[in-house]
């Protein structure tokens, strides 16, 4: 929990009252690899801050194929934000891909913090801006870059995650097959 408080304090001043409120609404959870936090179709009212480990969000198409939208590593947030903000069932599943520790927040109570403690709003606004920019870049990268270029960006964005994530998740995130991922890695090794 202290990681999150320190992260907030490194960017914004935080009153002791706001800090105490965060402690009162947050719950630290230890999770096992394979554990599901959000399941597609469920009502979503939780958001998670990762302090250790790695998680991913994904959807499943009509043919049963998984498409990984996001990996979340230390100091990242993850949830199905579209479901929360539109008050609709989850379109994503969020699962642990390694043993992890997260800080769980009730999304409504997290939103209430802005009303009670306006100094917290810039921190969360920055997080949302980073999330939107990240997704925007991801869409553009999928449309404009080669598989090798996307793979190189993936390695920059998620250093060392390859050691913890199965190849089929990485291929899914990059929008390629596992065979294509093997070819991309072989090309990279030749350079």
Predicted regions and their residues:
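Cyclic nucleotide-binding regulatory domains
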Residues: 36-96
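Phosphate-/nucleic-acid-contacting segments
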Residues: 145-191
